[in-house]
Amino acid sequence: MSYNRLGESYGEDDHSHSPMMNPHQTNNRSPSPGRPLNAYQLSDVSYGPQERLHMPSSDLLAEQPTYSVERLPNSYGHNEAYEQHHQQSYPGYEYAVDPEAHHDAYYTQPYQPTVTPHDDYDLGQYPEHQHQHSYSDDRIPMLQQDNPFGPDPYSDEYQVEEQADGHTPSPAPIRRWKTVKEVQLFNGNLVLDCPIAPKLLNQVPHAEPPGRDEFTHMRYSAATCDPNDFFEERFTLRQKLFAKPRHTELFIVVTMYNEDDFLFARTLIGVFKNIEHMCSRTHSKTWGKDAWKKIVVCVISDGRAKINPRTRAVLAALGVYQDGIAKQQVNGKDVTAHIYEYTTQIALELKGTQVQIKGRSAVPVQMIFCLKEKNQKKINSHRWFFQAFGRVLDPNICVLLDAGTKPGKDSIYRLWKAFDVEPMCGGACGEIKVMLSHGKKLLNPLVAGQNFEYKLSNILDKPMESAFGFISVLPGAFSAYRFVALQNDKNGQGPLERYFLGEKMHGANAGIFTANMYLAEDRILCFEIVTKRNCRWLLQYVKSSTGETDVPDQMAEFILQRRRWLNGSFFAAVYAIAHFYQIWRSDHSAIRKFALLIEFFYQTINMLFAWFGIGNFFLVFHILTTYLGQKDLLGTTGKVLGVVFEWLYLATLVTCFVLALGNRPGGSNKFYMTMVYFWIGIMIYLAFACIFVTVKSIQTEVQQDGFTFTDLFTNSTFFTIIVSLGSTYVMWFVASIIFLDPWHMFTSFIQYILLTPTYINVLNIYAFCNTHDITWGTKGDDKAEKLPSANLKPGGKVDVDIPQDDGDLNAQYDTELAKFAEKPPKEVQVISEEERQADYYKGFRSAVVLAWVFCNFALGAVVLSAAGLDRFDQSEKTSEDSNKRSTIYMAVVLWSVAGLSIFKFIGALWYLVVRMFRGV
């Protein structure tokens, strides 16, 4: 149950740790998710083991219907003639999630393309002619244009002159001519095989003409369905179109919204380095020279209108995106996602804040780029990843990354290793580090405080939870799951079913509790995996696997981020604690179940402390400041300071509530920054109070006759303050040293301590005051530019526009490169006039409310000698004086009311007298 199962085996052969761990291992495969030492339920897979498509033993492309249609001559694909003569039914899930028959036959595939002048590693040879040996290379996912399965589906080809003002989906060079081809739609699906620009092609090894391979063409699919129907609608991916379909051991997804090219490239560079590392492990039984064939990188962008143009240009530079071929509709169906596939051999590098093309990469990388038509949030992106693409590829391990998170050079391998070592590992995560830019960002106290918080979580929280086998949250920014552990049972219930409920929990019919809970849906997924019926999956923390990410450096951004985190984690924790009994439906041992119950009890105590955090902090503040008012400490000075700070404390607390209930953090930044500075002052005063009270208590003990060191521990003040706080801080330091990671104690400890009141008061108040806000902090969908449609013609064909000319392809490629060739313009946050005016009105309202509340509070405090004013007068007459002031106040108020009533009565009588004489 250790937090790091890699230990010293890292660097050895991947399976040399224990031959007994995988008794069924064959064909150089990794441990199957269904191959633990003891069997577990296999029948809970919703798709079920079904009849597989027959594959020949050779590397020839199987005689199978495919949804690909020909884009150019030589393209791979079938036509109607084949389907008419080869009737075949298709099960609901061709590549079933069946752990007992998991990819045994598809692990070692030769990679032997033609040697070119660009080559510096062995690539073998292609046949000289296209029809020779009938595509013996497994990398060629295509059929011949005129093959035994049917004739070329093209019937006509003609050219039209494109007008200069022709509509294109995004800025592109104006083409002089565009070739229009009639393309056959199969089952209503449009799939195009698009040649890449010669400028790009000449940089990488590829098949010599007329040969074609995964390096010469990019594959585009216009998905017109929901992710859950992707397979049933007969869409597929390149990896399944080879003669011997490639097995996907690692399926890596990078989700993004509108991240810029720098953040995206930073993540992609880290992923590429990990793939290079796995290809360099030549002694491994799973990885090695051709390891890249077992790894697929999927980039999913949330909304065509939202993607950053510079980021899209980087994808085009890699060859995985081309402008101008996407369609809005196919045969009257709206396109829901544009799917681009290409195996890139282009590397990226960062120079300062600029992305540059490095040239040829060390190893190829199989990439899928899914550009969703609409902005439907991150959870929908994960639906495309798991339900659509995952169902087709049937991977072993899925790795989740956010754009901007940079994995370490071998971090993904180390995550995979955790699954390899522990067959029952259902999920794992690494250490999330704050990106500090060589320490420069530590000058920002907010960044330093978050750095300490992250470190403390990775040193104490996650290792402890990993020891029990249940980590409350595997961060979506960098985590991994075993695909089979996520699958639903035969009734459609399970981890993925519960996880994707969150997509439906943002409408009018969603309960507010459930909607808030699904702001942290990754916590729900973790709980469902560990408590999965008749299974015994565990979650693990892998400290040796790291990922770096940026954190908010502005208070407004920080508050908005933590609002979602705090609300989601709180309600998800309530859900987990309330459903702790579901642990009994799992197949864990009795000892493990007991350990998990202990962890749930620990989380309950943590949740209670979070619930009472504001009250606990105020009580500690009040008790310490009251101590300072004693005669043997600060005396009158302590009393005055205590009352002043208490009034300011309560005033700031009320201000937090008023702002949280109606103001946007970005529009009230001055208010919030003022409060942060005040809370820092409060923490400094509290630290001074702790030290001063402790020193005075020690001096008092020392001055007594017969003093011994043990007498200090009999002093309640010393024992309460020093022993409790000291043990906490010393424990942090010792744990950091044990984990060989102590530097944050020297660089970030003070900043974290000073920001503690801000964490407790500002963040918690804003979060709980905005439980009605169940958004992810992103704006609504912008209107995307309309794309051309592919309309059905007689004969089941559509017209598609194709840039045929090499000059056009090169010009388009140069245009994309130019988009990120220059340094990005400095991002300036533009606030609209409507937002500015709304912020002004809300700020004025908040100021009026605060002035009204504070004046009434001050009146009550003065009359009743409350809120600390009674500390100034310690005489015995204090009670009598207070009663006298109350009596006088009551008399003033009541007689004032009576006087006002008399005044109004006299005025009313005078009105009647005047009216009587006027007669009106």
From Swiss-Prot:
Its EC number is 2.4.1.16. It is found in: Cell membrane. The keyword Repeat does not apply. Induction: Expressed during exponential growth. It comes from the Eukaryota. Belongs to the chitin synthase family. Class I subfamily. This is Chitin synthase C. It comes from Aspergillus oryzae (strain ATCC 42149 / RIB 40). The gene is chsC.
